[in-house]
Amino acid sequence: MTRRLPLLALPLLLAACATPPQSQPPQTLYHYQLGEGTDDRPLSLAQAVDRVKDADIVLVGELHSHPAVHLLQANLLAELAEQSRQDGRGLVLSMEQFSRADQPVLDAYLAGRIGEAALIRDGHAWPNYPSDYRPLVEFAKAQQLTVIAANAPKPLVSCVGQEGPEWLDKLPASRRSQLARELTLGDDPYRQKFMASLHHGDADGNARRFAAQTSWDEPWRRAWSIISSSIPAGASCTSPATSTWRGGWVSRAASPAAIRR
């Protein structure tokens, strides 16, 4: 049976230093504080891990390039790994920072078949990889954790926005598989919220924009499906920097049909 956190239980709110819980202003950009509830009650890292220890999936949002956020991610991953060892559960790291097209390169690095320079070059690592995401990958490599490259390839997403979802039918199978098999384009609350935010453009153009956004979001749900089918029941996944538009992907992923164990 799949266990899910309440919607948006994570990302946790960031503000100041985490251990012990306190509400003092941050002293440096490397200080963070976790908070919970509408009143943002201080929460220690150990308390946060205890809150999510039974979850199948932990979502961690981020402010790109903010040192405290990336420090939190590294600390959280280490704590979750220790918790998973104690509980006998597996742990998988899913990352926005690599696209699905780069999964073979990432796998080769984790297996020791290529070096870090090749990973950065051929895996199209972001410019801030050495400072912000390397600790996650190196920890996963040392602990022999599975790492999922979860992002959609940007060129494919751009073409969907320009040509529409029908363009995907023209792709060879090897490229088409890098996006979700089907895009969720129905008139659900996510689409309504997205369309309401657009204040220009015609209906067809906006529909293509929504298809592009959905093609960006859907591979995250696909990554969860891969994880669910490839690791033992009871394992959990932590996913930093979720690629969502104002929480819409999280809403969709929380639906019962989104994840099967």
What are the language-model segments listed below?
Residues 58-59, 92-96, 146-150, 237-238:
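Structural recognition of the beta-strand scaffold that forms the well-ordered cores
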Residues 6-16:
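Bacterial N-terminal signal peptides
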Residues 40-41, 45-81:
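Zymogen propeptides
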Residues 16-55:
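N- or domain-start disorder-to-order transition segments that initiate the globular core
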Residues 91-92, 103-223, 227:
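A substrate-binding/cap region within the structured catalytic cores of diverse enzymes
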Residues 6, 19, 189-261:
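C-terminal accessory segments enriched in acidic
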